[in-house]
């Protein structure tokens, strides 16, 4: 309708990568059509960098992940970047896409992932490693980084599993070690400069390797002991650092946060407003990987969290709020925050 075109000038309502007969046959077709509330639409002709943000699991799991929402919002605040989402298709659509040779596509534009500049994959747990290969295979992107050309996107990995990236290093062009808010702007700016320069893919990776927190696997030689443990790990390129240091956001209060998170069409595992009240944990439990990775403890300002709650409820229509952290009971302003939220929103 005319009204729909006005509200969503570049919406996917009039275009789908999947035919109607496919959507009618598969389970939960809303996983694949895009167009949700707060999904960001842009004109491809007005941007310089296309970034596909991937959670390598089904839509219901990926849409519940706060980290994806944070980076999606942060990237799309830039006028020169369009960040879109992609998730692992369920078995039924996977089968159809292979049979009909339909390349995996982004939700917002419905364009093939292989046509993007970057494919960013968050790696939250080892059980999703096979899904990463599924994503690359369905996208028609060469599985191994060494086989990719200038026609392929750069594949970058992030998330907690990148602290031990070697098991999957051959499939990635680069990894980001640490919290994503710190260095992506520099990476995107470097890509824009490289894109029109006529330089090789390797030359861009050499530039990326100079950015703090970025690990480019092809620039390192790994040697292993007979039992499979790492024996040595040395750079083979002058631009690669001997040690890649994790990057952390010290001031989480002023870090980017999504005031308009995407609201899914279907029920997902965490279907509510999420307030990240702190990062890190004071407990130091030896069995907890996250408690070690996300040190030190950094708290968000309680007054800022109160405002976030107002804005996010208004922008989403959600009726529930969850307080997210590794140990929310250790948040120093917990009593004040919870009391305020109960009193303010009880009706």
Regions found by a protein language model. Give the residues of each.
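Short, small-residue-biased leader/transition segments that mark boundaries at the very start
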Residues: 1-13
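Active-site loops and adjacent core secondary-structure elements that bind or stabilize anionic groups
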Residues: 12, 173, 263
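Helix-enriched interaction subdomains in cytosolic or periplasmic regions
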Residues: 14-28, 78
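N-terminal [4Fe-4S]-dependent radical SAM core
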Residues: 22-52, 59-60, 217, 223-274
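Canonical Radical SAM [4Fe-4S] cluster-binding loop centered on the CxxxCxxC motif
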Residues: 65, 267-303
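A short beta-strand-loop structural module common to alpha/beta enzyme folds
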Residues: 79-92
């Amino acid at each position: 309708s005319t009204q729909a075109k006005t509200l969503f000038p570049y919406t996917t309502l009039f275009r789908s990568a999947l035919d109607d007969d496919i959507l009618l046959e598969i389970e939960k077709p809303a996983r694949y059509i895009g167009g949700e509330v707060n999904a960001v639409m842009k004109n491809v002709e007005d941007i310089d960098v296309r970034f596909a943000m991937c959670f390598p699991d089904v839509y219901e799991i990926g849409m519940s992940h706060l980290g994806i929402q944070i980076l999606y919002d942060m990237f799309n605040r830039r006028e020169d970047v369009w960040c879109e989402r992609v998730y692992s298709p369920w078995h039924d659509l996977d089968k159809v896409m292979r049979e009909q040779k339909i390349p995996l596509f982004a939700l917002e534009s419905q364009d093939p992932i292989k046509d993007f500049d970057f494919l960013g994959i968050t790696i939250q747990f080892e059980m999703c490693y096979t899904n990463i290969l599924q994503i690359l295979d369905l996208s028609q992107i060469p599985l191994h980084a060494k086989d990719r050309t200038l026609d392929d996107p750069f594949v970058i990995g992030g998330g907690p599993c990148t602290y031990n990236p070697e098991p999957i290093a051959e499939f990635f062009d680069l990894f980001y070690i640490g919290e994503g808010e710190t260095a992506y702007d520099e990476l995107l700016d470097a890509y824009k400069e490289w894109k029109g320069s006529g330089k090789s893919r390797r030359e861009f990776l050499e530039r990326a390797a100079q950015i703090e927190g970025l690990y480019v696997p092809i620039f390192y030689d790994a040697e292993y002991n007979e039992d499979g443990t790492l024996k040595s790990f040395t750079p083979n390129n002058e631009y690669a650092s001997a040690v890649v240091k994790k990057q952390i956001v010290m001031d989480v209060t002023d870090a980017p946060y999504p005031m308009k998170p995407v609201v899914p069409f279907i029920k997902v595992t965490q279907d509510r407003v999420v307030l990240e009240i702190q990062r890190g944990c004071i407990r130091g439990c030896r069995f907890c990987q996250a408690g070690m990775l996300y040190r030190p403890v950094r708290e968000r300002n309680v007054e800022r969290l109160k405002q976030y709650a107002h804005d996010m409820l208004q922008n989403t229509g959600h009726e529930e709020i969850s307080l997210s952290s590794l140990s929310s009971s250790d948040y120093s302003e917990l009593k004040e925050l919870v009391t305020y939220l109960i009193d303010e929103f009880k009706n």
